[in-house]
């Protein structure tokens, strides 16, 4: 037996099939070097939609994974798509398309992969070899759980394979605590959503408002502060309840792997265990500060930050970005925000993201006429911006990856959440850890006219929004801002030195 074959026999093969959403795909790519550091003999196969070839290839290059002998990167889908996707933005329609694509790639290729047969790579346009041993661990995007996991289980059973099935869950654990676990106070999400879907279709909206949208019962979700149920959707209807409900029956058969700091989800871990669900939380899967590609390149962005640092000092820029899937601010709200920042002579960067065309035209005009107070970008290199000494604040939707980047760079968060885990991170960080502030007057829908659990009435008027923005931005340099900066610093230190995360990494590697 050659040394190579001996190593291969002892190796464990991990198959990763993440979502095409950049917020799910990028951490899955960054997971690979972290896995190899802990399990040097591991073999990895990752299936990536060819639509994200340009972005994914750059991320893989940071770690030389594109030419690593133990890593097979295989692209699927329609090759022409890769020419259309040179940015990270994906809307809800695109998100659902990626889910369908994952189901198809599993249907077409899973049996071939476990048999170590070649499969088709859409980027190079031909079949490529797979690893010589079947996967011992298969981890697939969580939103496809009801469809892909049973498919794989059936093939595993037919072939007599013992494969550990896992679902990739790059979401904060405190959101999944709401959708999966039993709250310490109040009825569960599952109970509420089941009642919604049991209602006749013509009564579905009424049932939704009764169970979630307008419900004023108090819930205390694990690892979160108490809220009224209607506060769980502050800015839009629940986009993901049908997906979540479909996942729930399957979860006890799989391991849910979160790219989230484990110390922030210890109550959730216990609550999930009580339901027979394993939930390792393996911490941030983000580029390390030392990786190439994490520095600003010369251009108007770097010039703006460097100039502001020289003129106004450290922590003087507010970076505004709402992620790559949703854009919670409407035209009027965004206009008020920009007016307040400009009137207060603040320095700011706005990532236009998925804002409407009308909102983009308005924002560009206001910023271009702001006498250099701000700049706008279609897409922003977020981590390098947060690393820059001039950047002091992050006005964010509060997605998991953005939040962990803020923790790593010590940048306090000003939350404007849209949906899903954003809402619960915006609950946990300000109210439990004093590491951010959540804007309340920008809430809409059934939240308007109602009083939050903390006693603030959401008026939602133009004046109320303007007043809240003015108050908060005016005191960022005072004790209010200093407390938030200290809170995020403490969380960042705990994230980088988290024994709970290392315990969960060990559990994942040993699946």
Label each region the model flagged.
Residues 1-246, 273, 287-321, 326-511:
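Glycosyltransferase specificity loop/lid
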Residues 135, 251-254:
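Short, proline-enriched alpha-helix->beta-strand connector loops that line the catalytic pocket
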Residues 257-258, 276-288:
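Donor nucleotide-sugar binding/catalytic pocket of nucleotide-sugar-dependent glycosyltransferases
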Residues 53, 240, 253-276:
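A short, active-site helix/loop in glycosyltransferases that binds the activated sugar's phosphate group
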Residues 164-167, 266, 278-281:
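Short, well-ordered strand-loop elements centered on a beta-strand within folded domains, enriched
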């Amino acid at each position: 037996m050659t040394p190579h074959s001996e190593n291969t026999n002892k190796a464990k093969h991990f198959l990763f099939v993440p979502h095409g959403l950049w917020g799910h795909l990028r951490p899955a790519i960054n997971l690979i070097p972290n896995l190899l550091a802990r399990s040097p003999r591991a073999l990895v196969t990752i299936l990536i939609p060819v639509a994200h070839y340009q972005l994914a290839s750059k991320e893989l290059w940071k770690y030389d994974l594109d030419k690593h002998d133990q890593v097979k990167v295989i692209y699927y889908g329609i090759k022409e798509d890769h020419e259309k996707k040179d940015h990270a933005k994906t809307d809800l329609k695109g998100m659902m398309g990626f889910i369908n694509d994952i189901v198809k790639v599993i249907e077409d290729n899973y049996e071939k992969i476990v048999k170590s047969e070649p499969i088709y790579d859409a980027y190079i346009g031909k079949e490529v070899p797979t690893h010589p041993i079947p996967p011992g661990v298969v981890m697939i995007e969580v939103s496809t759980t009801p469809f892909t996991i049973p498919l794989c289980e059936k093939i595993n059973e037919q072939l007599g394979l013992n494969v550990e099935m896992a679902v990739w869950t790059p979401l904060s654990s405190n959101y999944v605590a709401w959708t999966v676990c039993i709250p310490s106070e109040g009825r569960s999400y599952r109970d509420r959503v089941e009642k919604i879907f049991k209602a006749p279709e013509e009564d579905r909206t009424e049932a939704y408002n009764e169970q979630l949208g307008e419900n004023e019962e108090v819930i205390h979700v694990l690892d979160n502060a108490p809220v009224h149920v209607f506060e769980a959707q502050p800015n839009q209807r629940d986009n993901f309840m049908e997906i979540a409900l479909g996942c729930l029956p399957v979860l006890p058969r799989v391991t849910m792997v979160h790219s989230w700091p484990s110390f922030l989800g210890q109550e959730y871990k216990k609550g999930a265990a009580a339901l027979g669900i394993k939930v390792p939380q393996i911490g941030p899967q983000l580029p390390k500060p030392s990786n190439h590609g994490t520095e600003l390149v010369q251009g108007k962005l770097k010039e703006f930050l460097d100039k502001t640092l020289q003129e106004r000092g450290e922590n003087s820029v507010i970076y505004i970005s709402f992620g790559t899937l949703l854009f919670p601010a409407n035209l009027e709200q965004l206009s008020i925000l920009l007016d307040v920042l400009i009137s207060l002579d603040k320095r700011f960067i706005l990532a236009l993201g998925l804002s409407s065309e009308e909102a983009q035209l308005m924002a560009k005009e206001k910023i271009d006429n702001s006498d250099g107070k701000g700049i706008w970008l279609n897409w922003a290199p977020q981590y390098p911006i947060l690393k820059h000494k001039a950047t002091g604040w992050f006005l964010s939707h509060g997605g998991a990856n953005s939040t962990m980047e803020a923790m790593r760079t010590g940048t306090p968060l000003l939350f404007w959440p849209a949906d899903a885990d954003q809402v619960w991170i915006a609950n946990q960080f300000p109210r439990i850890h004093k590491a951010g502030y959540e804007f309340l007057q920008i809430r809409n829908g059934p939240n308007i006219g109602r009083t939050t659990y903390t006693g603030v009435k959401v008026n939602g008027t133009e004046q109320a929004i303007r007043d809240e923005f003015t108050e908060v931005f005016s005191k960022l340099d005072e004790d209010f801002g200093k407390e938030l900066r200290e809170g995020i610093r403490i969380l960042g230190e705990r994230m980088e030195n988290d024994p709970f995360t290392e315990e969960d990494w060990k559990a994942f590697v040993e699946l």
